[in-house]
Every structure is written in structure tokens, then in C-alpha cells.
Amino acid sequence: MKRLLTVALGFLVSVGLWGQTAFEEIAQQPSKAGGIYHMYPESGFSRPTPAPKGYKPFYISNYGRHVARFNSSNSMYDRFDQMMQKAHDDNALTEKGEDFYRRYHAQYPYCINRGGDLTEKGANQHRGIAKRMFTNYPSVFKGRGRIDARSTNVPRCILSMDYFCDQLKRLNPKLEIEKTVTRDDMAFLNPHSLVNPSVTPTDEGYNNKYAYWQDNYKAMCRENTNPEAFFSRLFKDWNYVKNFTDDPMKLEIDFYYLACSNQCLDYEESYWDLFTQEEINLLWEADSYRFFCSKGPDDIQGGRQWAFCKTLAEDFVKGAEKDIEEGRCARLRFGHDIAIMSFMTLMNIDGWSTPAPTPHDAKDLWQDYNVQMGANIQFVFYKNRKGDIIVRFMNNEEDVLFPIESAIAPYYDWAALKAYMEERIAVAEKIIATTQAPPKK
């Protein structure tokens, strides 16, 4: 009983249920304001919960998000340089604006044509995750263990797979790792792509312009931004920015994304000083709400988006069965944040699956910074001498509890966990069959 209480208390701490609000978390750890650009920690992980007596780990199945990268938009970097250079030449900048101009002008050459590229910080993130996995589960990666590694066909994910697998090979050169990159795997590695036969063009991606939730998201953006106040600190006349955009609100949000993504770069520069703390909080809230609506438990679309992730759930189940039968020691997958968001919601994990009564309630129920650069989910399989199999599930290397009974939580009987996952897959199939893709507007 004492052990179960310890696990439960650890889980409560890990999901922030001691009354701390999201804004308080951001004040305590400012990098969380970066949302999905939040950096994966290098240390501070809980010690693995001891397995029941007689059980040893023998197989791992994971899904890892790519690690730290540049902002995905090359054009954003270019537009900022062109705008600030012109404003400087026109003597249109305030003292604070000139300071930003000097700092950004120095950074810009480092960013040219690097949109979406991984950084060395990112490479080190996956080396660290791989090393901890190897160290925590040496019995999995012993001898000539065979590993199946797969990535989406996006370069940053392929490189993430390489960094991870290369680290494992350095730790045990005998490992036999087969790496695969094929469009066919996108159906489960990127469940919101058109390779998934359930997805239509108006369902595709994470920010589809036809999505049912876009109106709610845009309304929050209008409420949470103040372009006049923000740009008045940078430009002598804030209306000057209208020479470069017909949507000052979006430009303010782009400044926020620049600040978010800069923490991922090897180039040391921060732009959070451009914002007040209230602006940071509100901009983060709107961005997190976008993902909450798109791939989280917002009920405006009836669960359709997270239901697409049934393909990943199916691959976890079928892949584990296949690998255990054929003697592999691990199956490693590398992809994107939205798959992890959707999977956690699909599995009805506490802290990931609660709808918000109002848009502004979402921020304290669900936070996008929990799917930071390098975010991951891991199923670790254990067995005893009789061949009984139990599984522990982790999100970002911390134990997570499934909503099913287990006297040995955070460990679960594999047959029971598989049955639960198949139930959730059936729920997802019903949702997809009974909901409609958004119409083209």
C-alpha cells in the first residue's frame, strides 16, 4: 500500500496537481513560455520505480518527437531582417527597437536557410535520452540485440533517429539496428497526414485552416494580443508596421514565435525582454489553446483529430507482439509533437483528456509545453522466469498511470493493457466513422 501511495504522489507532482497554475509554472520556469519549443531537461528525472520481484526488462517500444530545431519558417527570419533593417534606415525605431535591431541583425546570418534544421542542442537531447534509456535498462540492450528504428520522412526526424541510434551503438557496438524511412509508415508515425486513409484534406495537419476550432482560436488571439501596445515599444509610430503587414496581430504573434524558438538555438540570444510578463502569459495561452483544440480534448470536433492516432496505438500493440515473437529488443519511432498529444488524449490519460468549460480554462487543464522538443512516450516490457509480461508506461521518462486497475501500478499486466488499448482503438474508430471532416469554407 505504501508503494502504491508513493507512485500516486509522484504522479500528482509530475502533472502539477498541487494547485500551481500554468502562469505560475511559467514564472518559475520561463522557458515553458516557449510551448512546444520548450527545451527537454538534461537532468532531474525521477529514479525508475522498482519492478515487482522477479521481473526484468527485455523490450522497449517508444515514440520520440524530434529534438530542438530552428523555427520552421525560413521566410520569418528573412522578413524580420528586412523589416528591422528598413525601420532602422528610416529612423523609425525607438531605443528598445534599435537594441532589438542590433541583436537580431547580428543573429540573422546564423539563421539564413536554416528553417526547421536541428541544432547541436537538439542532437545532445537525443543523445541524453538514449544514454539514460541504455543505462536504466541494460538488460534490454545487451549483446547483439536487434532494434527496429523508423522515422517520418522529415529531415529533422531522420536526424533525430540517427543521433539516438548512434548513441546506442556507441554504448554497445554489437547492437544490430535496422533504420527505415518510408512514406508508407507515415500513416502511424504522422497520423494526421494524408497517408492515413481516414484523414481528408480538411483534416490534415495541426493547423488546418478549415478546422472547426479556428474561429475560437482566432477569437482568443484577438483577446490576448495588443499590437499597438507591443509595437509602440519598438517603433516611434506603431502604425509603421502596417508597411509590412496587413495583420499586426499576426506579426506580434510571430515575434512571440521568434522568442519561443530562440531557446533551441546554439546561438545564445533571448528576446523575451521584448514582452511584458502579462504579454508572455497571454501569447502562450493562445498558442497552447490552439494545440488543445487541434489535438487535445476540446470537444468542438467530437474527438476526430485525436482519434486519427489510433494508427499509432495499433502499431504499438502489433509492433510489440511481432517484436517479442521475433526476438527484437526495441522498436524506436521518431516523429512529431501532435502524435504524442493525440496519443495521450486517445489513451484517456489523466491530465490530457479533460475538456475545458471555457477557452480560458484550458490553460490549467492542458499545456503544450509538456510536449517539448524531444518529448517521448515509452513502453518498457518486463518478464519473469515463467514468461509473464508486465509493462510500465512513461511520458518524458516519468511514470504515467493508465485508467485501469493494477495492484502493481505503475506496472500493468500486458494482456490487460493491450485489451485497454484495443478498447480505445475501437472508440477512435467509432468517432472517425460518426464525425464529419470540416467543410471547405
Summary of predicted features, one role per range:
Residues 20-146, 152-331, 335-441:
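Signature for phosphate-centric chemistry
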